[in-house]
UniProtKB/Swiss-Prot annotation:
PROSITE patterns: ARGININOSUCCIN_SYN_1, ARGININOSUCCIN_SYN_2. ATP binds at residues 10-18, 38, 119. The keyword Repeat does not apply. L-citrulline binds at residues 89, 125, 129, 177, 186, 262, 274. CDD domains: ASS (cd01999). It catalyses: L-citrulline + L-aspartate + ATP = 2-(N(omega)-L-arginino)succinate + AMP + diphosphate + H(+). Pathway: Amino-acid biosynthesis; L-arginine biosynthesis; L-arginine from L-ornithine and carbamoyl phosphate: step 2/3. InterPro entries: Arginosuc_syn_C, Arginosuc_syn_N, Arginosuc_synth, Arginosuc_synth_CS, Arginosuc_synth_type_1_subfam, AS_cat/multimer_dom_body, Rossmann-like_a/b/a_fold. This is Argininosuccinate synthase. The gene is argG. NCBIfam families: argG, PRK00509.1.
Length: 404
């Protein structure tokens, strides 16, 4: 087998990716490990992360600002798709993986690397997402997955890293695995592996507890154009600002926590904790606006598309042909999704209290009203019902005779 000399490693500064650096050099004999750190709005000092990679043995460490691309190319399409895996999880972590993989491949091309690598474990979802995305964009590139091969527990990985002077970022007593980006936080491992164990309050940072949230509600309005959120409370914002503002508003009122049993790609169930206040809020508002601007049959069919879209993204097929086709359908439905939605935030809840679309509303008050202004032709109902239920009536008549 050809000796690999230069590898690009997706790097986060966590246990697994930090340990990957000396492991690749000592176990694989790779001379140059170039790390790539993705700035996804995680609010971390990435210069410190970059320096940690160098201190851990990386020959070079690159930081890429992907925040705008992450929101515009990944988060906003997910909002249009009302993407909720298992009707709960808005894919905050899953959406980041194909973007990171895309940049890994691009950097590998630029520096003539022999391979790309990541620190995903052998029973997580991210290994699938990274590998599938890399294979789609750089099918000629070799993928190295040390954490999938070394068969070390998290505690053993920490000890391995300490031999090379790599400090552990987590407590050995309760080693939570936490992933953070602008869209939210995912927390797993430690005491959370007991599905009956309540998640401790100290693992949350984006959302207030119900007890500590404001005692008075706050009403907000979210404005959409072509299915994209463009403003909050009549203030038009950039896509990144939209997510930031939604995070702050929803999180302050304790909305956006998810505690779920998740069906992983590899076939096991896992307990996951998520904080995604802004993304959940925007999806809720978007779905509500669709209820007044889309035809019933479009809403019904789009619901099936949304479920499949979420599954594909969760399972790693962001760059697959079916996902691309579903994108085209979803996009075609969004030209009329224009308007605003009013939501009341209070004690962990986001309650829709109003919705309107000035030019695209299919709701007509003169048809829906029960007042004297009603223009609905009630006399047509009898004939409609007769035709609508005719097949059922014929079936009932036939079967009642058969029973006799």
């Amino acid at each position: 087998m050809q000796q690999l000399k230069k590898v690009v490693l997706a790097y986060s500064g966590g246990v697994d990716t930090s340990v990957c650096i000396p492991y690749l050099k000592n176990e694989y004999g790779i001379s140059e490990v170039v790390t790539f750190v993705a700035d996804l709005g995680q609010g971390e000092d990435l210069e410190l992360v970059r320096q940690k990679a160098l201190n851990s043995g990386a020959s070079k460490s690159i930081v890429g600002n992907l925040v705008n691309s992450f929101v515009e190319r990944y988060a906003f399409p997910a909002i249009r798709a009302n993407a909720l895996y298992l009707d709960k999880y808005p894919l905050s972590t899953a959406l980041a993986r194909p973007l990171i993989a895309e940049n890994l491949v691009n950097i590998a091309r630029e520096i003539n690397a022999d391979a790309v690598a990541h620190g995903c474990t052998g029973k997580g979802n991210d290994q699938v997402r990274f590998d599938l995305a890399i294979n789609a964009l750089g099918p000629d590139l070799k993928i190295i997955t040390p954490a999938r091969e070394w068969n070390m527990s998290r505690e053993e990985a920490i000890l391995y890293g300490e031999k090379f002077g790599i400090p552990a970022p987590v407590s050995k007593k309760s080693p939570y695995s936490i992933d953070v980006n602008l869209l939210g936080r995912s927390i797993e491992a430690g005491i959370l592996e007991d599905p009956m164990q309540e998640a401790p309050e100290d693992i949350f940072s984006m959302t207030s507890s119900v007890n500590n949230s404001p005692d008075s509600h706050q009403d907000i309005e979210i404005v959409f154009k072509n299915g994209f959120p463009v403003g909050i409370n009549d203030q038009f914002l950039t896509p990144v600002e939209i997510i930031q503002r939604a995070n702050n508003l929803a999180g302050k009122h304790g909305f956006g926590r998810i505690d779920m049993i998740e069906d992983r790609v590899v076939g096991i169930k896992s307990r996951e904790i998520y904080e995604t206040p802004g993304l959940l809020l925007l999806i809720k508002a978007h779905k509500e606006l669709e209820s007044i601007t889309l035809n019933p049959d479009v809403i019904d069919f789009k619901g099936m598309v949304e479920k499949k879209w979420g599954q594909l993204v969760y399972q790693g097929f962001w760059f697959g042909p079916l996902k691309e086709s579903l994108d085209a359908f979803i996009s075609s439905t969004q030209t009329s999704v224009n308007g605003r939605v009013k939501i009341r935030l209070y004690k962990g809840n986001a309650i829709v209290i109003g919705r309107m679309s000035e030019n695209n509303s299919l709701y007509r008050e003169d048809l829906a009203t029960y007042s004297k202004d009603d223009v609905f032709n009630h006399s047509l109902a009898e004939g409609f019902i007769y035709m609508w239920g005719m097949s059922n009536k014929i079936w009932a008549e036939l079967n009642s005779k058969t029973k006799d």
